[in-house]
């Protein structure tokens, strides 16, 4: 009977755990939808920015403009902005980011370049602090759905480091959101800005859908519609001054997009992890139920045998 009670208690505990994991899965799904809405909300600004850059590009050659954020210089120190998460229970999301970061640091060091880490997310901060890595700045406890203000804060500090020549190049390492079950860490260059990319805002947007009772993600290519400026358009300011003022906005927009995509990747990883945990809990409950029935059947059989043996003894 003690064995039966132990199995019953374990079944109860697993059922309670399954309720928690299922609730966490649904919460993560709701937050993925919010991340999707945020991405859609930033599209008009990104499109308009691309149009302005396109119009400026028709008035001057961006490759020939001498602006600090476009200036290439010999690379001695690279600032690597790494976007990870603050919490666990999201599968291999944080581990994959950390692994790719270590690989990128080795690649840069093998070419004789020094690396300064700018870390977003408590998991990355804790990992690299334990290993005495060269950390320039840390950012923890950001919003679960990143905001423009948070992106601007990070962007301003990266700009200051680049313009003061503390770093000669800035790279961004974040997790690109592919689907609910697939994501991959990618590295892209942030600073100096590439003039050839300023007037093209090609990217993708994602939508969380429900099909057949299951969550699924649909991605679609988005190409900003740009048009040539009217021939009689007059710039009240020097186009170079306008460009110089807009470049930080472009950088912050790139950062915000990356932070949003990384947040969606983390939430999708948490959804998948909690879904797997719920499935495993259901399977364990089924296995424990069989064990309970067998133990109960054995106990009943034993009692019958004892009754029969007692009757024969009389």
Curated annotation (Swiss-Prot):
Pfam families: ATP-synt. It is a peripheral membrane protein. Its main location: membrane. Gene3D superfamilies: 3.40.1380.10, ATP synthase, gamma subunit, helix hairpin domain (1.10.287.80). Keywords: ATP synthesis, CF(1), Hydrogen ion transport, Ion transport, Membrane, Thylakoid, Transport. The keyword Phosphoprotein does not apply. GO terms for cellular component: plasma membrane-derived thylakoid membrane; proton-transporting ATP synthase complex. Belongs to the ATPase gamma chain family. Produces ATP from ADP in the presence of a proton gradient across the membrane. The gamma chain is believed to be important in regulating ATPase activity and the flow of protons through the CF(0) complex. This is ATP synthase gamma chain.
